[in-house]
Each structure stands twice: as C-alpha cells, then as structure tokens.
Amino acid sequence: MSRIGKKPINLPQNINITIIENNVQIQGPKGELSYKIPKLIQIKQDTKNNKLFLYKTEDNKEAQKLHGLCRTLINNMIIGVSQGFEKKLQIQGVGYRSQLDGDNLLLNVGYSHTVIVKPPKNIILEVENNTSITIKGIQKEQVGEIAAQIRRIRPPEPYKGKGIRYLNETINLKVGKSGK
C-alpha cells in the first residue's frame, strides 16, 4: 500500500469539492480546477471531518503507482485554489534585465534581440527591480514548467554564474584556466 496514498487529505473550510463519478472538481477563492481520476482509484469524501480518502479498486502494480500520484495531485489542486503557488527567478549579469509589456515578459539577457515570453492565461508574471521575476498560479505543474522555460532561455553559466536562476539556487562555479 502506498504510504502517501493512504494519508487522508484535509480540506480547508473555503474549498468546495464536487465528485461526479471519476471527476473531481475543486473550487476555491483563487479559482477552479478539475481532475479525472483513473478507474483503478476510488475517492470518498468525509463531510463530518472535512477529509478526502483515496482507495485502490484493484491490487496490482499500476493501481499502487496511481494511488500516491492521485492523492498528491488532488492535494496540490486544493493548495492551489486556496493559497496558490509561486516560483521566483533571479537574473544575474551585467546588462541583463527583464520587464513586463502587458502580460508578456521581455528579457534582455545577452542576445542580439529581446526574448518575449507569453504566459498561459492563468499564470501571472511579476517583475521587481528588473532582476527578479515571480511566477504565480494555481496549478503547481504549470508554474514550475513556465519557470523552467524562462530559466532555459539563459541558464547560469558555470564560470561567472551569469544567467537566469531560481531564487536561492546555488551554482557550483568552475575555476578558470590558469595562466602560464
């Protein structure tokens, strides 16, 4: 049995959950998300204690894999619609900067052109002091994916550390060539 899957999910007071067959719809103050549960997993709601429980309908390897996965995905959806998720990026380098143009993010990171990043409709980008970018949204996977796409534009280089990095990410710097 999955150690993660057998844990109950606590529901905050401001969350509404509707379960119709294998579809779970979660509504909260930040928005609304839905998820289709695989047939190998069954979900039950305890309205007295405000908890959700997930059970396996079969006892095979695939059901074991999906048990913990479904519980984690539903828990992340609940956190997303109640609190939201955010990732922070830092830009380091001489002349490297970012700015917002409407919803689009404009990056000047050492290329001959400005790189334009167009976020999906439910992702909010914020820029503070031209060198830090905050990505906010209700879907954890989507927030992380957009952050990874922005970082991939100019990843930190190993000699001086110039580039786009996650906040508090440590870069192992290499020692340059020694002179003769």
Swiss-Prot record:
Q: Which GO terms describe its molecular function?
A: rRNA binding; structural constituent of ribosome
Q: Which cysteines are joined by disulfide bonds?
A: none
Write down the SUPFAM superfamilies for this protein, in alphabetical order: Ribosomal protein L6
Q: Which domain of life is it from?
A: Eukaryota
Give the record's subunit note: Part of the 50S ribosomal subunit.
Q: Which PANTHER family match?
A: 60S/50S RIBOSOMAL PROTEIN L6/L9, LARGE RIBOSOMAL SUBUNIT PROTEIN UL6M
Q: Which family does it belong to?
A: Belongs to the universal ribosomal protein uL6 family.
Output this protein's name: Large ribosomal subunit protein uL6c
